């Protein structure tokens, strides 16, 4: 049965997740506590908000609260950073196994395993059939055998990051259809995309909270606590950070927590000669939230990239472009080593390029063999949109074609009898490098992205065929 192992809220995801800073978001978390403990409340709660308003952070903290109260049914934190965590077909299998493992309903695990054994072709099922066989039937039967009073809560975060929004709409439809008769609740977060808003069009079926409509003064107070906490953590001087500059930074953040988080990372970036100077530079710039919800974030991203590209030569600029292409458009996060192999850039050049991008890209401290990724989905939105990113725009079609050719080039370079591998997921070949495994698994996906065009020359296919078909 397909499932996403990195979808649980506390999993070691490519970009680490965290809960809310202490004493922030108290109102919404208190509201969610009351909803979770009230069996007469609606079975579905939708937290929606624009990009960067803190939905995932709230969902993480709420999951922690539920777990501490022994009322967490399961979590699926969707993310575009991995194929499985963006696949809607993985949500129900992942959730039902978590719910069964928590043993709120003693007979549930046995019932689900029986359902899987009886239906080996379940991977190809439609969402409605999955939900009926792995949630509705076993959960209804298991509930008869328990005295559970408080309904466990299933947390589904960032559904807007799933790759097929038509399947998300299908999932929401079956949740609404069956939720009133099930002994579980559903907490769902997403951006207010049009298709998702249509799914939540009937207000009597759910509770909802619009995060970007919270009173601005409440959000500003929370953002101020966050900024002070972060900057104090990196500099504990008595007069740091200056209150006037904190207030200016709070005003610049508007209601965007991701703006405050990105600015703080930028100010405290490793190797920064002067945090005070960076703070002063930021607050004296023109990055206010003057128009549009994400407008200030786009300007901030542009400012950080301006600094990263400053004083670079042509080769260094090309390296940054290529690295960002791999980080933003790879279907799974790659390590620095794998990016070096795949995109043909020495590791020392990658590390040099990334040194000024720590506020945009998560780079683990454990070394070059750990995957790196963008901190937030809004950076993908920025870099892939020509209107938003202007001179830093990385065309998706050109980028996918570039990666596809690099995949084939790598396969061609390392081809040998020893390097033959199976394309089948079941075969574990530890001698195959991360970059080669990625290339063999994903070159066709990159080539089939929208208008990329013909997959490759006959010569490439003939040369590389043995690697990915053997």
Name these PLM-found stretches.
Residues 103, 415, 451-454:
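Long, hydrophobic, amphipathic alpha-helical segments used as structural scaffolds
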Residues 321, 380, 437-444:
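Alpha-helical repeat solenoid scaffolds
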Residues 440, 444-470:
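Short, well-ordered secondary-structure microsegments
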Residues 1-404, 409, 419-430, 457-469:
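Conserved NB-ARC/NACHT P-loop NTPase core of NLR-like innate immune receptors
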Residues 411, 415, 431-438:
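Amphipathic helix-loop-helix modules that constitute alpha-helical solenoid scaffolds
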């Amino acid at each position: 049965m397909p499932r996403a192992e990195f979808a649980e809220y506390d999993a070691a995801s490519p970009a680490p997740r965290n809960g809310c800073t202490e004493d922030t978001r108290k109102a919404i978390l208190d509201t969610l506590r009351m909803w979770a403990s009230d069996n007469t409340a609606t079975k579905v709660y939708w937290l929606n908000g624009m990009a960067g308003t803190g939905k995932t952070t709230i969902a993480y903290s709420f999951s922690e609260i539920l777990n501490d109260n022994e009322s967490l049914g399961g979590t699926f934190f969707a993310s575009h950073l991995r194929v499985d965590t963006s696949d809607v077909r993985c949500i129900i299998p992942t959730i039902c196994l978590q719910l069964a493992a928590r043993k709120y309903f003693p007979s549930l695990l046995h019932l689900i395993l029986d359902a899987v054994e009886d239906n080996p072709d379940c991977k190809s099922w439609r969402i409605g059939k999955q939900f009926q066989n792995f949630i509705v039937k076993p959960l209804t039967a298991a509930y008869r055998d328990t005295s559970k009073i408080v309904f466990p809560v299933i947390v589904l975060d960032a559904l807007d990051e799933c790759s097929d929004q038509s399947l998300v709409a299908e999932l929401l439809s079956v949740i609404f259809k069956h939720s009133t008769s099930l002994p579980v609740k559903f907490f769902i977060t997403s951006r207010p995309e049009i298709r998702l808003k249509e799914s939540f069009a009937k207000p009597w079926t759910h509770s909802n909270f619009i995060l970007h409509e919270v009173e601005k003064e409440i959000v500003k107070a929370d953002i101020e606590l966050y900024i002070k906490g972060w900057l104090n953590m990196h500099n504990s001087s008595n007069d740091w950070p200056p209150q006037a500059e904190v207030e200016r930074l709070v005003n610049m953040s508007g209601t965007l927590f991701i703006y405050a988080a990105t600015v703080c990372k930028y100010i405290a970036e490793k190797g920064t000669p002067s945090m005070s100077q960076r703070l002063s530079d930021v607050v004296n710039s023109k990055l206010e939230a003057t128009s549009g919800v994400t407008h200030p974030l786009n300007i901030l991203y542009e400012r950080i990239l301006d600094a990263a590209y400053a004083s670079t030569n042509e080769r260094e600029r090309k390296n940054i472009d290529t690295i960002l292409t791999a980080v933003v458009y790879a279907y799974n996060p790659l390590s620095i080593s794998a990016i070096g192999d795949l995109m043909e850039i020495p590791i020392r050049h990658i590390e040099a390029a990334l040194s000024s991008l720590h506020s945009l890209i998560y780079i683990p401290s454990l070394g070059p063999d750990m995957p790196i990724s963008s901190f937030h989905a809004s950076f993908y939105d920025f870099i892939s949109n020509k209107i938003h990113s202007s001179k830093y725009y990385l065309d998706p079609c050109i980028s996918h074609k570039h990666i596809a050719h690099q995949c084939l080039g790598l396969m061609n370079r390392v081809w040998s009898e020893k390097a033959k591998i199976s394309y089948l997921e079941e075969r574990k070949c530890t001698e195959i490098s991360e970059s080669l495994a990625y290339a063999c698994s994903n070159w066709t996906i990159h080539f089939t992205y929208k208008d990329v065009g013909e997959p490759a020359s006959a010569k490439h296919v003939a040369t590389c065929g043995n690697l990915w078909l053997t």
